[in-house]
A protein has these predicted regions:
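Glycine-rich ThDP/TPP pyrophosphate-binding loop and its adjacent helix/strand module
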Residues: 1-95, 270, 278, 284, ...
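Thiamine diphosphate
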Residues: 11, 95-96, 100-323
Length: 325
């Protein structure tokens, strides 16, 4: 399937160090396509009992210590070529390799810092822009000229805000799961253009009917830094996105989710598109805290156009994983 999509697919023996090294080298050398490395592995590889009987491919070795599964730790270490008396021993030749690599990387870092220093001195305006992008902050904006219809739908108000941002926030990227004309992320698209093969000059990503993939890509953008990702779809499809949304909250990523059509009044689609219970699930995620004890998520459900504008202000200005419904 991935080969049919145009990916660079490499299949290897996941226990062969040389094959792993060659696959990673080939992946780094590939400049045009994404790479998928498939490592075929055996569960409990090398695990044996005291009498030498194999514990490979046994489900019991998963999710508990080998000894609890019935294998013998010392016998397994010996079977894998290690020293059962000192199982965490670092061989001298391995230590030398890591020492040499440490020095190589230190030199590389020194070189990169010199290059950055030179670039910044020669490109002062771009340097300031880069710092702004990486800070996660946005330019100061005057919302007074933003026109919102007083009795319009909140998603229509959201479209107006997105159009406003498209002209003022250079590093914001908006995505939609094949619903931009319905979730009204097209307010952003109308002021830019979608990515296409060989052309990434726009600021809109048409993700297709792939909600989880879209959410994961948004997480990746946030982890890389320098851009503000937002993605939209119907609220009922948040179920497909949930693993990525939860991880975004735990990782304290500044990702904005735009979920529309959030009640039983969603037109002719019927019960399959009526997210009656979903808000309770998402609201519970507000209780997630990161390792610093900080709340990682803010859930916003604006009732009218004015609240929608305020919700977007919070979404843009706060460094939280934000849900804008």
């Amino acid at each position: 399937k991935y080969e049919a999509w145009g990916w660079n697919v490499i299949t290897i023996d996941g226990h062969d160090v040389e094959q792993i090294r060659e696959a990673l080298t080939a992946a780094n050398a590939e400049k045009e396509r994404p790479t998928l490395i498939i490592g075929r592995t055996v569960m409990g590889k090398g695990a044996v009992a005291a009498d030498g009987s194999s514990f490979e491919d046994k489900v019991s070795t998963h999710g508990q210590p080998l000894t609890a599964a019935g294998a013998d730790f010392a016998a397994t270490v010996r079977n894998l070529g290690g020293d059962a008396e000192d199982p965490f021993k670092i061989f001298s030749e391995s230590g030398k390799v890591f020492d040499a690599r440490r020095e190589e990387l230190r030199e590389w870092v020194r070189t990169q810092r010199e290059r950055e220093k030179t670039w910044r001195s020669e490109h002062k305006e771009l340097s300031r822009k880069l710092d702004l992008f990486l800070s996660g902050k946005v330019p100061e904006m005057d919302y007074k000229g933003l026109e919102i219809k007083p009795d319009g739908a909140t998603r229509a108000a959201s479209a107006s805000v997105l159009s406003f941002y498209a002209e003022r926030i250079e590093n914001m990227i908006v995505a939609s799961a094949d619903l931009c004309n319905s979730d009204k992320t097209d307010g952003y698209l109308k002021k830019t253009k979608a990515f296409s093969k060989g052309d990434f000059s726009g600021k809109f990503f048409q993700a297709g009917v792939s909600e989880l993939t879209m959410a994961c890509i948004a997480n990746g953008m946030a982890l890389h830094g320098g851009v503000i990702p937002a993605c939209g779809t119907f609220f009922v499809f948040s179920d497909y996105m949930k693993p990525a949304v939860r991880l975004a909250a735990l990782m304290h990523l500044h990702v904005i989710y735009i979920w529309t059509h959030d009640s039983f009044r969603v037109g002719e689609d019927g019960p399959t598109h009526q997210p009656v219970e979903h808000e309770a699930q998402i609201r519970l995620m507000e209780h997630l805290k990161n390792h610093r004890g900080e709340r990682s998520m803010l859930v916003l459900r604006p009732a009218d156009g004015e609240e929608t504008v305020t919700a977007w202000k919070l979404a843009i200005e706060e460094h939280l994983s934000l849900i804008h419904i």
